[in-house]
Structures are given as C-alpha cells and as structure tokens.
C-alpha cells in the first residue's frame, strides 16, 4: 500500500528523493511484541514509520494494533484509537495509506466480524487520522446492517394420479419438515397442489393469520389427474406471488416444485412460463421424485423449471422416502440466499465485502478495496467528501468475475490528464488481471486491462504506479506476481507502461529475483524510492519475503528509461546479511521520504515482528583525467642508434581526480580515502617505460581527499631502446574510494557509485618522421615466389611456402600490411619470423645493412564476393622505415582433396595506415602449375597358373592358363586410369596363347585390343640369355582397359585366361621356358602424378613355368633285368655245388652232433633190427 502513497506524493510534487545505495550494516530496528508487527509499514509525514500489527490482541473481540516509530528516538509508541465495540476482530493495521497537503493517515481493518442470526459476515472499517494521529473519521461511517431476511416461499406439489396416497402423505410430511426448519418471523409460506386443475390450499395471508401454521396442511387432499406443471407455475406467479395473497414487495421469492414425472396433457410450454418467473425475480427449486428422472428428457425438464445454474437448484431422489435426505440441503441453500434481491449467480452482495483490504488516497477521497463483495468478485468504495460512497466494480461488463478478488490491491495513476484508479484481481479466472478505471460523468468505468498467464500466480497481488521522470504523469505500473512459479525462482514483477490512446495494455520487461529460490514470493511488496542514482529516473524496491527459507530479501532496481526498469537489480539485501534472526524480510515496504534528516531517502522494510529502517549513503563520483607534457615522445628519445641507451625522460604525467556528489547534497565537504594505482603499458610483456619514482612500471599512492579536483604529477623514463614505436605507451589508472564516516550523522559513510568506472587509460604517442608536412608518403612494393617448387602436387605437397618481399622506397610506413589472396583448398598455417634490411644505394645498387628480426601477426578471413580466402600479415608495432626491405615466409596447408584446377593463382597486395593510394607496385600475382597426387597400384594376384609340364608326345595338345592382376586405388581422390596388358600370342607363326580378358567388377570398363610385333628376331640367342617368352621376341596382344573413374579404395580384378599350345616350345631348344604377361597402369600425367617413391607399383608381371620331358618304354628294361637275374643265380648255384658246399657241411654237422652225445656218458641208443 505504501507504493501507491509514494506515487501519489510524486504526482503532487513531493520533494526529490536523493541517494543511491542502501546501507545494510548500520540499520535501525523497531521491534514490538504485537502479533504480526511489521505486516504493513508506511513512511508518514517525513517523520514517522507507521507499523501495523493486525493480529495483536488488544482486548476481547478486538484484534489489531497500530504503532508510530521514530528514527531519532529508536522507539515505537502505540496509536490509540476509539474502536467501536461492534468492530469485532477487526485486524487493524492490515492495510495503510497516507496523503499529503494536508497529511492524512488511513489505517484499515478488513475483518470486522458482523453477526446476523446464524451467519457471521466479514466487513471492514478504516480510521482517518490527522498528522498528530488524532482520530478524525471512520470509513464506512456506519456499520452495515444485517441483510434483509424476508422470504416468501411457495410449495407447488404434484397431486396427479401417478402418485400413490402413501407417497402423497410422505410428500406432505416433507413440506411440513421444511416449513419447520425455515420458520421464522420473516418467512411466510403458501401451498398450491396441481394435477390437470389447481387448488390453493393456503396463501401467505392464511399463513400469517393462523396461530398454528402447520395445521394448514391437515386439510390437504390429493387431486389426481394429469400433470399440468407449466400451467401450475403460471398460476403460482399470477395468484400467489401477489400482494392480494399476502406476498411482500421486498421479500425474496422462492418457489419449490415437487413432482414425480414429466408434465402430461399441458399445452403450455416452459418457454412461455419461465421468463415470467424470471421477470418476477422468483428463485425456483425443482425436486424430482422417482425413477422417471433417470431419463435424460425428464432431467432436462427439471433443469427447465429450476433457476440457473441448474446444478445448484435441482434435486433428484429415487422415491418419496428419500425426500427427508435432502431436507438439510434445501434448508442450507435457502438460508444462503437470504439477503439477495435477485436470483443471480451471486450468493452474497456486501455481506463479505472486507472493505479496507487495500487502500489508497485520491484527490476525491480515500478508496477502499472490497475484495469480498458480490461473492468475492470484488470492487472498491470511493468515499468523496460529504457525498455518498461510490462502488467501483466490473458489473457493467457482463464478465464472470466470481472469486476474482478485485480490489486486492489498489494504486492511483495520473493518466491522459485525469486521475485513474488501478485495481488488482489476482484470482480472476485463476490467473489474475489488473484493471484501469477512469471517471466519466461521475461514473467509474474500466478502460484497459492486462491479464496474467499462469494459474495460481496471483497476478496483481501488489501494484505500484511509477512516474519515471517526475513530470506528474504516471509512466508505468509495476504488477507483482508473487506466486509465479519457475523451477529455480518464485515470483516476478511485470513492468507495464501505461497504454496509449486506442491501444491495448501490455507488459514489457519482467523482473526476477535471484536464482535458487522457487518459493521466494518475489513481488509480494513494491515501493517507489525516487531517483536514487542521479539519472533523473525513478528507482524502485521489491520485496521477496520467501527467499532463503522465508528469511527474505529486498531488491533495488533502477529506472532504465521513461517506459522501462532495468532488468537486473543494482543491489540485493538479504536477511542473512542482518545480524538479527528475522523472517519474512521484505513482506512490506515503504520508501521515498527522508526520515533521518540527512537529505537522503530512506527505506522501511517490514518483517515478522520487526521493522528495519535502511538509510541510503551519499554517493561520490570520480572523473579522472591524465595529461602528458610533452604530449608525444620525441624521436631523439626513442630512436636509438645503438642497442643500449641510457635512461631518458619521456614525459611528465599529471593525474587528476575530480570528486563530486551525485546528486548534490547539503552534507558539506565529504571526505574519502582514495587509493590509486598507476601502471605503464599494462598487459605488455616487455617494458618500454618506467616511473622515475619507483624505477618500475607500477606506482601506488594513497590520499585522503575532499570534494573538487586533486592532481598528482609523475615523471616517466625510457629505460632502453624500444622495438615497438608505433603503439602509444599507455598509462592505466585504477582507483578505489572508501568514504570517511560522518560523525554528525551517526557515522553515515559516503561511497563510490557502483556504476562508476574505477579505471582510466591515457595514451602517450611516439613522434612520427613524416617530414615538414607531417604526412608520411610511403612507396611500397611487393613480390613473392615459391622457393624450390615448380609444380604443386596436391596430395603430395602438404605445405606451400611463399617467400614474400616488401620494399619501401618512400617515407616511413605505419601499420604496413601484406594481404595474400588464395583459393579455397589452401589454409594459412604460419608465418616465419621475418627479416628487415636497411638499404643503401651505392652505384645504382641497393646494399643490405642493419638486419634485424620482424614479428608479424596474421589473420585470415573469407572473401565471399570472389570465393577466395585472404590472409593479412601486419607489422603494426614496427615502423617500416623508408629505404627498408622486409622478407618473410608464409606457409599454407594444402588440403589433399583440394580442387585447384591446372594452375594456382596467388595474389598479394601491400598497404599501410598512411592511406597512400595504391600503385601497380603494391599488387603482385603469380601462377603455379598444379597436379594431383594419386596412389594407384597393380599387382599379380597369387591365384594364377604357376607351373605346367608336358612330354614331347603332347606337343599337339593345349592347356588352360590363367593370369590374375589386382588393381587398387589407395589415394585420396578418384582418378581415371587405363590398365594395359601385354601377352605373347604367337611365336614365328605358331600359336602360343589364345587369351581373353575379363573384368566383372566394373561394367563401365571398356577394353581395346591391338597386335604388336616383336622387337627382336634372334630367338635362340634370346633364349640362351633368358628363357622367357615375352613381347620382345613374340607377337603380342596389347589390351587397354579404360576405367572412367577409379574410386577411392576401389579394388578391381582382371583375369587373362586362354588355351596355351606347346608346339612352339621346340623352337626355343629349351626344356624349361617362362611365359610372361605384363600389366601397367597409366593416367594423364599432365594432371595426375603418382606419389613419389611409389612409381614401381604402376607395373606388374606374372610368369608361368613351362617344362618339357621325354616318355621311356619300360618292357625291354623289365625283360632284360629278369633274364640277367636268372642267369646270375644259376652261375652262383653251380659254383657252390662244385665246391661241395651242400654235402660236406651236412655230414660234419651230423658227426659233431653224435660226438657230443657219447662224451656225456649216456648210452647210445640201439638201432632196431
């Protein structure tokens, strides 16, 4: 609520808010024992923090307290109010609002418990207090009376013949029970029975004239007949709900229809009757008894009778015994409609209004949000002076606003020249919306609205109108969405610029809290701080009381433009930074006033049981400057004739810091301790300059300074010769500032603006040698070559070296750059360290002297317009002197798959920062022939005819001989090739080999044949040297097979196969001869080149050994051998016989045997006689 108060102050020209950052260390704590102390906070009258404690128990039936807290006393005092005794459990302090000129405070309690018989209603009460906290007026001025209770109820019961007498009695018992439960002085009853005719049993007059109303039911008898339900309803409208029958003008009219089935025989339709009931504002209940209403048509008839929505007004029971089950339901529904004047979807009007749930002051008077009015559709009451209150809602829009909570939040805007009221409805359609109301002809009408997107997000729970540029008009509205859920953070705030004329209202930037707090409730509280960073745009504070497990946090966001807020916070203050253990820090906020009397805006933050006052600190800004004397380095200082030079003075540097407030306050000369570090050539590896004071490249000083300008002077030295005399020497200043606490303001400490740059860089250039006109006119030329390379073989030569030479025949050249243009397929790899030569012209010849190295930096970019790439190499940090020449080597990678055509064109261009127009010498181009490396191979396959033999008698026979060759492409590109075969086919007119070639793997291959004559004719001499039959001595068949494209890793097989004759071998006078076939791969050598060292694989041979042998007759040999063996055996036998070999040996053997037997003494056996 405080946000809208600040917006109102800004609209009325409230004092400018100063400051930038919040001091989270030196806080003022206000603490009281009141329950929920800190639920609401409000800065009031530039002196007080008013705090609500809506759950504090003051006395019996009196809840809620109000406190005023002062910064200088550090204490809080209760604000005494005369709370009417009827304001039971008011929850005072739940919402607060204030106005200025004059100062008024509005404190509200929206939970006044108002008892009306059995019901307890919730209304509200607000107290208007003056600047001295004196109670002036209450809103509303009088408590709402209990809603009227008068009810006229008619029972219309079905007496047709389809109902048995027993069931009819049960129906009368049900009527009697309902009359007993609803009977009270303000309720009257009447009864009509219908079938195909109608009978009024008693009117309202009869009911009030009898002392025992229930006795009126004793004379009711069943009519029987058809069911004329529609006509019966018409009779009720015209005969019973009339003043003649005792119906009251302002009473709620209720009709209860009880029937057991669909109407029968009735010519009158419900479409003719029901509009009459609607016009008479009769609330209708339809009770269907029996299984007939299981039928869909019967159900539709009940719905036609009943009021809308039908599910609230239709009852269906299975039988008449079940009527007693719905007695209580019917009673509760009828009780619920007490006080309603018309049968609408609203159950309540203002009985649950809860006025004061939110509040804001307008020039016409205070506005109190009434979220519970009309069944929580919501709205707001405006209380003009001396006039009746005006109720503001969406009733004219024919929109379903049930449970929308319109008025949950309120804000004031000055828009299109008129004051507008902004109301939040966070539960509208479950996603929420915010509506802008404007006053036209003393009536408030909705003019624009914006809706939420996420269910349950509470879009519009908090509002804050912001005048960004303080011109009196509202520029944008902040809409809090505290329950918006994301996986890593909870809550958001939508930044919604005020809509233009005729345009829809929409929101732009969305503000978020820190990641990691899915239940953070970011956006639960909003307030305007004013311009706290001096950019003339308002800044805001946003509370997130659910972050850090309900400890809470507050965010500060700066204005970005007249229509926007910066998306990132400038500061986050969390409860964990505060020593005290607090919860829900940021649940309420109020800012925009100077309560501490230091000229700076303060922020009051509510938490559970505690309120903290955060002060903003004075902001200092520093504007650094650096001046050099002299302003450039003289050539006499940095041009060294020798490599070693003594230290020389470069320049005097004057460093100034201008310290000032932003914005300016009345706090006097704020002092601060400033530490500044100076560094020469920050980031460079080599040292070119040093400080005289430290003899190094760094210098640090610490000073305590006040406001205004402060300067320091330092001397710079050149310690040695410099190689880079192109790039200026830089002096980098880094500084930090710590404010000196102001004792008179309780040690309030100034601080450096967080968006201030704490560094500054100044440059000290070198003097240029450009003659009297100070314009350097260089005269550059460039040439290049390809050292030791005549042809580029793509795929073999992986690198291409380009030797570049640049000459300068004019004045000094600065930022000399050589750009090489080359086709796609080449890529820059490196540049070698170059050499620079000073040249002296002697006898018309340039002589090299003074050689030194050159470091180049190269960068490659595509030149899409020409389909080329370019590499630019520059010596930016070296002056290319007049009369000098530089050489360097550039290396390119050559892609093995590059397609460069038959010639490579390279182009070079030289230029400089001197901006001298180009000449023919500044460009150069050169062509280099190009071939493409291939790696093809042909080899003899191991599956071929290796050996054949034959006899002299088989000279006329033939045998199949097969030679196989394998062809492979092992390179990185497809290549068209020809496979050549040379095969002997005839020797001196005699056939050798009738060969055919097959190549089944490649059907596109085409083969061609031609016959070749031998080159040698002395066959015998050739064979004696080498018994090989080849194409040098025999007629040969030359086969050429053309392959249009031999693909990468392709593998092909060629088979030479045919019948080999043997008759020709006798011409060679050799028993063993080798049959040789040869193969070779050929290709276009002007385009392709075999990889170096692999040329041998372009040729292959296959040899078959042929051997001749003689066939021998074995019969003579066998016969001769047999006869000779027999003769030899006969001769040997005869000789042995003649020698007595066979007889003598046998006799001696017998004698020896006998002699051995006698010598043993054994008797000799007798020979039988």
Curated annotation (Swiss-Prot):
One Gene Ontology biological process: positive regulation of angiogenesis
Organism of this sequence: Mus musculus (Mouse)
UniProt protein name: Integrin alpha-X
Molecular function as annotated in GO: metal ion binding; receptor tyrosine kinase binding
Keyword Transmembrane helix listed: yes
Gene that encodes it: Itgax
Subcellular location: Membrane
Chain location of the short sequence motif GFFKR motif per the record: 1140-1144
Primary location group: membrane
FG-GAP repeats: 23-78, 79-138, 341-392, 393-444, 445-505, 508-566, 571-631
Keyword Cell membrane in record: no
Keywords attached to this entry: Calcium, Cell adhesion, Disulfide bond, Glycoprotein, Integrin, Magnesium, Membrane, Metal-binding, Receptor, Repeat, Signal, Transmembrane, Transmembrane helix
């Amino acid at each position: 609520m405080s946000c809208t108060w600040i917006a109102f102050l800004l609209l009325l020209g409230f004092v400018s808010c100063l400051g930038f950052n919040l001091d989270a260390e030196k806080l003022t704590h206000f603490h009281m024992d009141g329950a929920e102390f800190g639920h609401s906070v409000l800065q009031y009258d530039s002196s007080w923090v008013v705090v609500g404690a809506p759950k504090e128990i003051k006395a019996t039936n009196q809840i809620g307290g109000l406190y005023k807290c002062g910064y200088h006393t550090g204490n809080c005092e209760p604000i005494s109010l005369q709370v009417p005794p009827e304001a039971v459990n008011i929850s005072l302090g739940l919402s607060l609002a204030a106005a200025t000129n004059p100062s008024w405070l509005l404190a509200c309690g929206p939970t006044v418990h108002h008892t009306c018989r059995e019901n307890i209603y919730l209304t509200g009460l607000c107290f208007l207090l003056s600047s001295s906290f004196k109670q002036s007026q209450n809103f509303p001025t009088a408590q709402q009376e209990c809603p009227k209770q008068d009810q006229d109820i008619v029972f219309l019961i079905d007496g047709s013949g389809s109902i048995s007498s027993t069931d009819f009695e049960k129906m009368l018992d049900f009527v009697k029970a309902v009359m007993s439960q609803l009977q009270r002085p303000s309720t009257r009853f009447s009864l009509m029975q219908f079938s195909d005719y109608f009978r009024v049993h008693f009117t309202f007059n009869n009911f009030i004239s009898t002392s025992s109303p229930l006795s009126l039911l004793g004379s009711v008898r069943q009519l029987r007949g058809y069911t004329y339900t529609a006509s019966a309803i018409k009779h009720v409208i015209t005969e019973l709900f009339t003043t003649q029958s005792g119906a009251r003008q302002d009473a709620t009219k209720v009709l209860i229809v009880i029937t057991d089935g669909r109407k029968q025989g009735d010519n009158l339709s419900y479409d003719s009757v029901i509009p009459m009931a609607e016009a008479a504002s009769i609330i209708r209940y339809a009770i269907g008894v029996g299984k007939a209403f299981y039928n869909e048509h019967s159900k539709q008839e009940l719905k036609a009778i009943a009021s809308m929505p039908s599910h609230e007004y239709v009852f269906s029971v299975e039988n008449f015994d079940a009527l007693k089950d719905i007695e209580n339901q019917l009673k509760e529904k009828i009780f619920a409609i007490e006080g309603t004047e018309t049968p609408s979807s609203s159950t309540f009007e203002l009985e649950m209004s809860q006025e004061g749930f939110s509040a804001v002051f307008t020039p016409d008077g205070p506005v109190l949000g009434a979220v519970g009015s009309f069944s929580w559709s919501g709205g707001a009451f405006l209380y003009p002076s001396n006039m009746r209150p005006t109720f503001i809602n969406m009733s004219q829009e024919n929109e379903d606003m049930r449970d929308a909570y319109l008025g949950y939040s309120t804000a004031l805007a000055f828009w299109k020249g008129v004051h507008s009221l902004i109301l939040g409805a966070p539960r509208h359609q479950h996603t929420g919306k915010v509506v802008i109301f404007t006053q036209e002809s003393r009536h408030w009408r909705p003019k624009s609205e914006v809706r939420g997107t996420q269910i349950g997000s509470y879009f519009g729970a908090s509002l804050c109108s912001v005048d960004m540029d303080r011109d009196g008009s509202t520029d944008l509205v902040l809409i809090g969405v505290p329950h918006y859920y994301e996986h890593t953070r909870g809550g958001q705030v939508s930044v919604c610029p005020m809509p233009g004329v005729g345009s829809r209202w929409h929101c732009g930037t969305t503000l978020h809290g820190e990641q990691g707090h899915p239940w953070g409730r970011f956006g639960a509280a909003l307030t305007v701080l004013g311009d706290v960073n001096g950019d003339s745009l308002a800044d805001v504070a946003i509370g997130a009381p659910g972050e850090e497990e309900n400890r809470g946090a507050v965010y500060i966001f700066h204005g970005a433009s007249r229509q926007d807020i910066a998306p990132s916070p400038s500061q986050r203050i969390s409860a964990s930074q505060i020593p005290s253990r607090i919860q829900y820090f940021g649940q309420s906020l109020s800012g925009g006033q100077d309560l501490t009397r230091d000229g700076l805006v303060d922020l009051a933050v509510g938490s559970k049981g505690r309120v903290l006052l955060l002060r903003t600190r004075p902001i200092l800004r520093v504007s650094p400057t650096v001046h050099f004397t002299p302003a450039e380095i003289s050539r006499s200082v940095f041009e060294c004739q020798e490599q070693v030079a003594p230290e020389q003075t470069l320049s005097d540097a004057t460093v100034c810091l201008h310290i000032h407030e932003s914005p300016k306050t009345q706090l006097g000369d704020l002092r601060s301790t400033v530490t500044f570090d100076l560094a020469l050539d920050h980031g460079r590896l080599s040292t070119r300059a040093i400080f005289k004071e430290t003899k190094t490249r760094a210098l640090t000083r610490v000073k305590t300074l006040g406001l205004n300008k402060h300067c320091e002077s330092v001397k710079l030295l050149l310690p040695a010769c410099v190689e880079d005399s192109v790039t200026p020497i830089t002096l980098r200043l880094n500084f930090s500032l710590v404010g000196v606490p102001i004792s008179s303001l309780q040690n309030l400490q100034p601080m450096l603006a967080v968006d201030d740059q704490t560094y500054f860089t100044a440059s000290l250039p070198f003097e240029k040698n450009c003659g009297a006109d100070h314009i350097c006119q260089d005269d550059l030329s460039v040439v290049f070559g390809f050292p030791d390379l005549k042809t580029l073989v793509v795929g073999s030569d992986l690198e291409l070296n380009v030797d570049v030479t640049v000459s300068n025949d004019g004045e000094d050249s600065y930022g000399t750059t050589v750009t090489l243009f080359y086709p796609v397929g080449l890529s820059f790899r490196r540049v070698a360290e170059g050499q620079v030569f000073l040249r002296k012209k002697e006898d018309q010849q340039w002589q090299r002297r003074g050689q030194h190295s050159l470091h180049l930096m190269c960068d490659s970019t595509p030149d899409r317009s020409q389909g080329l790439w370019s590499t630019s190499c520059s010596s930016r940090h070296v002056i290319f002197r007049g009369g000098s020449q530089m050489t360097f080597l550039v290396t390119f990678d050559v892609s093995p798959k590059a397609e460069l055509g038959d010639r490579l064109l390279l182009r070079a261009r030289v230029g400089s920062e001197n901006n001298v127009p180009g000449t023919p010498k500044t460009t150069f181009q050169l062509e280099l022939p190009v071939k493409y490396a291939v790696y093809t191979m042909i080899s003899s396959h191991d599956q071929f005819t290796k050996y054949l033999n034959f006899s002299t008698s088989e000279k006329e026979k033939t045998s199949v001989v097969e030679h196989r060759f394998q062809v492979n492409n092992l390179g990185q590109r497809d290549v068209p090739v020809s496979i050549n075969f040379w095969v002997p086919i005839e020797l001196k007119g005699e056939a050798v080999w009738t060969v055919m070639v097959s190549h089944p793997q490649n059907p596109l291959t085409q083969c061609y044949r031609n016959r070749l004559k031998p080159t040698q004719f002395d066959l015998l001499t050739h064979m004696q040297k080498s018994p090989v039959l080849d194409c040098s001595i025999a007629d040969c068949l030359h086969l050429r097979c053309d392959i249009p494209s031999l693909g990468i890793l392709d593998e092909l097989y060629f088979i030479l196969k045919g019948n080999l004759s043997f008759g020709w071998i006798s011409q060679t006078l050799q028993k063993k001869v080798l049959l040789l076939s040869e193969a070779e791969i050929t290709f276009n050598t002007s385009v392709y080149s075999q990889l170096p060292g692999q040329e041998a694989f372009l040729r292959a041979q296959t040899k078959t050994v042929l051997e001749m042998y003689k066939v021998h007759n074995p019969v003579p040999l066998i016969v001769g051998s047999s006869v000779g063996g027999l003769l030899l055996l006969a001769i040997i036998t005869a000789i042995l016989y003649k020698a007595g070999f066979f007889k003598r040996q046998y006799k001696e053997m017998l004698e020896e045997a006998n002699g051995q037997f006698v010598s043993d003494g054994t008797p000799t056996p007798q020979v039988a006689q």
